[in-house]
Amino acid sequence: HDRKKTIFGPNVIFDGERCIKCTRCVRFCQEITKTNELAVVNRGDHSTISLFDGAMLDNPLSANVVDICPVGALTDRDFRFKVRVWYLEKTPSICPGCSTGCNISVEAYQNKIARFKPRVNEAVNSHWICDEGRYCFHDLAGGERLTTPMIRQEGGLVPTTWEQALQAVYSGLSSTKPLAAILSGRNTNEEAFLFAKLIKNFAPEAALEVFCQERELSETQKIIMSPDRSPNFRGARDMGVSSNGGCATLLDELAAGNFSSAFVVGEDLVGSDERLRAALQKLSFLVVQDTRMSETAKLAHVVLPAAHFGEKEGTYTNRKGRVQKLNAAVIPPDGARQDSEIFMQLLEAAGEAVAYASPSEIFAAIAREVTAYQGLDYGSIGEQGAELTSGGGGAS
């Protein structure tokens, strides 16, 4: 018998007794990643797959060898023995890890995301996804969820009703200027479209930006990964979430104490940059809309519980201008609301009547108002996405 349960790397285990020596995994490391961690060793009926010369299978795309193994000899350490695959409910969607917009299947069990698998799209990610994207759902969808709005009273956050929370947000943001508004790059085009309308209603001169973090990439990472971690950075800016100063400039101004109020959606600013803690503590009014009680949310005057990427439907626009669909794979907990629903309720409180019944209706409004999206139809985007009709342009 060949070896069993051999650790090849941080994400992959090898069961040699299942292996048929097809060498797909070896060729993947030679031809795709060009990192050459795997090799066939020995001869005849003693031949086996092995790590080459003491290497570890730890390249940024390593878990793809699990997907291409035809017999289950290579297994995913994160998913191994978690759930029988035939119990999984599979939903086509888009990876929220970066602005490449890799096509994925979100596979869930008992209303929890169990794993991401790559979905073929030759125009975007071919057959692959990176390990960072494959496992990012643990951070984005894990942890204890917020399920009730909270409002600050006598120095602490206490539960409140949605009606009271939304009224407090409207009153606070309407009366406390200047305003900084930061939207997560994981919010959909439809949510960004509504958020831009909302902030411009509250304060036309507000500093409005989509959160963005960039990183340096190795040559192997560049095969599929984007320097920009925000999957819908381009789309959000197309929707008007931009006051043209850039996110870094806005955060510098926030740290310098140049704002009296802030509305932060879906990002933990303190977790990303500790220097912002003191500045956020000094704000006269801070609203945080998020899925969990983050370090930033702990400082808020009002906290609104929202849905995460796997619980929503809509579209992302990747860095190359391809509009692609997200689909809801799981149901949000009772008490949490869709970001788009929250924005529409605040717009209604501000006297702007918006009553879109679905993301497709919001997208139809986008196609009317945003130049680059004219001619696009939500129903015809399909599972492979659609290219923008022109080079991009903000909401008119």
Residue ranges and their predicted role:
Residues S174-T176, E191-P204, L208-L376:
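Non-catalytic alpha/beta scaffold blocks inside enzyme catalytic domains
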Residues H1-T249, A256-V264, D268, L346:
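N-terminal export/assembly segments and adjacent metallocofactor-ligating motifs
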